[in-house]
Amino acid sequence: MTPIIIFGAAVRPDNSPSPALRRRVEAAARFGAGLPDALYLPTGGKGRHGEAESTVMAALLRELGAAPDRIREEPTGTDTLSSVRACRALLRDLGHQGPVFAATSRYHLPRCLLLLRIAGLAARPVPIGPSRADRWTLRWYWRLREVPAIPYDAALMLWHRRG
């Protein structure tokens, strides 16, 4: 099995995926299509609108041709850290010990990979295409937003590993 963890993003009020969520799922589906044993792990709980992010992502994966038995929803993650912890537990329960792949937005990828690695998972990135955030102003906004989040979440993950 080759797990592909898809990190959540906003669901719109009409229950459709936001553009960021759609890009993450499409990148994971493209990547997983080339693997004989892809296991998609969409992670994300219920946000402000609609169903849980994981449920919306699972539906989109099926629309894109992923077999339902290759999708395992993780609907409890409320942020990046809790999603990593929940996916680590799920993979442990499945007996998985190999590499995992992370599908998310470019700005979010360094934090996801770091947290997965601190959690003891051999994490690698899923290639993702360009996004709206490729405009320099948005690109810097999203990058700067990650500056405090990376050390904060890393410290919390290390603390959780101790306990």
Map each language-model feature to its residues:
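A transmembrane-helix-recognition feature enriched in membrane-embedded lipid enzymes
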Residues: 136-163
